[in-house]
């Protein structure tokens, strides 16, 4: 079976399924990837046959709402050229798997019309019921709904072109247009619960300090520290938390760029803006107790989860972070926001705790209660890991994805 993956940052969400196919000597696995990610992909997956492309520059004078669409069309054209070059060499595929978010899947069917296309749908935008308009501190303008219609254009094209699709969670599936949901399966990428597991002897070292499992450590993780992941709620809650729990240490993992939403009002990012706000209010963060460690290598990041007594995960109604599931797999007691993506996984009082996203007082009191009663939280930790093992383990998710791929390959050969 020959499978082609298309993703500008290969392996991305396809890492584990690509690895499984590469390990199967009966499979030939190819990928089209952005040039910036090609070197890393070669190291991670040496058996992968790579075709890289350089993303073209955006054109000047494009309507601002169309800037992303313009870039996606241009990227789609470059990928189509790469596909045509493969086709001209008589290289064909049983299935093509693509992420449409950057436009790369836009013209796949024009080059390989009879090859089944399996598309990964990460998020379909809407002006109601999800991230947009959720946070009153950062209101959206009256043109927001119109901009989102334009932003969804490539996703609608992908939904129309694909033979089948998959998306990680039921909530993300529910955001898709009703008429397309029947061809999209719910299959998560999966969590390596053998690598991410509880370790009562775990130690995390940072700038001469040693943090150990069993200590009163509160952790927070996001790719980037921004409102979409509740950094404004968390940092503003810290002065009260540090006062209520004098013995705790706080570890914050994440960068200062913006992954989602609007740019920060401070040139150094949202964290700098919030830190300055707290200092001006007379409640500066104690650098001896709050440790912002930036982005970490994966092994170090796992150590942070393993030493955590309480892990805080806050998110707008948006794509669920891998970090929340990995925190649960590591046996952390997760206190999450009572937003739909989190509620799909965590049931308050059964495998974690939930608080209103905006309620800082509830967040503080729930953290303090968890720290004061560690024995009570033990059952929640065990149930959290069991949830991830039962529903999101690689051993379950990768075979489910391979089943989708093989079913489409079978349709082509039948």
Where are these regions (language model features)?
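Aromatic "clamp/platform" in nucleotide-sugar-dependent glycosyltransferases that forms part
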Residues: 316
């Amino acid at each position: 079976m020959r499978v082609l993956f298309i993703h500008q940052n290969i392996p991305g969400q396809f890492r584990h399924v690509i690895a499984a196919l590469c390990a199967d000597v009966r499979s030939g696995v190819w990928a089209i990837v952005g040039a910036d990610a090609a070197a890393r992909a070669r190291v991670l997956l040496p058996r992968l046959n790579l075709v890289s492309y350089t993303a073209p520059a955006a054109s000047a004078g494009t309507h601002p709402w169309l800037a992303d669409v313009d870039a996606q069309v241009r990227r789609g054209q470059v990928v189509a050229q790469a596909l045509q070059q493969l086709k001209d060499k008589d290289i064909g595929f049983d299935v093509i798997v693509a992420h449409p978010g950057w436009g790369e899947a836009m013209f796949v069917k024009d080059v390989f019309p009879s090859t089944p296309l399996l598309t990964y749908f990460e998020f379909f935008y809407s002006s109601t019921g999800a991230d947009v308009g959720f946070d009153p501190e950062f209101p959206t303008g009256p043109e927001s709904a119109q901009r989102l219609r334009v932003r969804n254009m490539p996703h609608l094209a992908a939904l129309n072109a694909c033979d089948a699709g998959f998306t990680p969670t039921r909530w993300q599936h529910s955001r898709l247009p009703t008429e397309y949901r029947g061809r999209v399966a719910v299959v998560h990428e999966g969590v390596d619960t053998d690598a991410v597991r509880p370790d009562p002897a775990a130690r995390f070292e940072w700038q001469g300090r040693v943090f150990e499992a069993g200590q009163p450590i509160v952790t927070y993780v996001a790719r980037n520290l921004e409102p979409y992941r509740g950094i404004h709620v968390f940092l503003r809650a810290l002065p009260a938390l540090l006062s209520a729990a004098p013995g705790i240490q706080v570890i914050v993992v994440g960068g200062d760029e913006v992954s989602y939403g609007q740019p920060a009002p401070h040139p150094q990012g949202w964290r700098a803006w919030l830190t300055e706000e707290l200092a001006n209010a007379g409640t500066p963060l104690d650098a001896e107790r709050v440790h912002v460690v930036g982005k970490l290598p994966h092994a170090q990041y796992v150590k942070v989860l393993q030493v955590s007594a309480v892990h805080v995960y806050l998110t707008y109604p948006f794509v669920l972070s891998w970090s929340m599931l990995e925190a649960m797999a590591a046996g952390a007691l997760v206190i999450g926001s009572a937003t739909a993506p989190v509620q799909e996984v965590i049931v308050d009082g059964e495998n974690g705790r939930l608080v209103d996203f905006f309620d800082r007082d509830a967040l503080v009191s729930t953290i303090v209660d968890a720290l004061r009663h560690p024995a009570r939280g033990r059952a929640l930790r065990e149930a959290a890991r069991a949830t991830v093992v039962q529903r999101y383990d690689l051993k379950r998710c990768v075979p489910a994805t391979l089943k989708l791929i093989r079913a489409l390959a079978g349709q082509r050969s039948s």
